[in-house]
Amino acid sequence: MAALTGLADEHGWRVVMVGDPCQFTAVGRGGMFAHLVDIYGGIELDQVHRFTHPWERDASLRLRNGDATVLAEYDRRARLHDGTAGEMETGIIEAWDQARCSGESVAMMANTTDTVNRLNHHAQAHRIASGELDPNGPALELDEQQLFVGDEVVTRRNDRRLRTDRGVMVKNRDHWTIETIHPDHSVTLTGRSGTVTLPVGYVTEHVELGYAQTSHATQGRTVDTRARVKVRTRRPAAR
């Protein structure tokens, strides 16, 4: 950050830093942005532009501020569903399939890595059963996943040495579609930033299925539809 602001000062650039204290906090130590605002001040944006429906725009602000009574509004509009973990996972896969078949971009979210892995497996299995993916074609075996041509994946590490045909570096949490799995197990991916071929070393360590992700990983994405599974483990009360 110091290097960036130093360059900006040298060349007369303007640096605009944007943050939201009500979003998920950093996994590690955080608080730097709030500290900067405390010292130098900031401008607060007070209008929401991201939602299509006015009711959801207003409800999102109440939810952001911790107003639990707004859940009744979501429930009234059939946005909340409950059931067993298995029922919820089946339901979210069905909703995901309906949304994407309608041409919508959709994000599946869950609050645990285990649930995310199961959703990714179910989504891939659904696409195999529907004939969208060929399990007998080129494939890549990872530790706990198998990747096929056409699978949706995410990259999990920034690497400035790997760039798309548009010159954009490969970044953590970028979303891609597998175009080609080469004999040497390198993989060609296509995403919003272009096409790139990743070496086998990067693929085996830093590529995974991307149909579902944790809520933290999905934060900041703009999609047409979101569906989220929250798994709650109940334990008997101590006596």
Annotated model-derived regions:
Residues 1-239:
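Conserved ATP-binding/catalytic motifs of P-loop helicase motor domains
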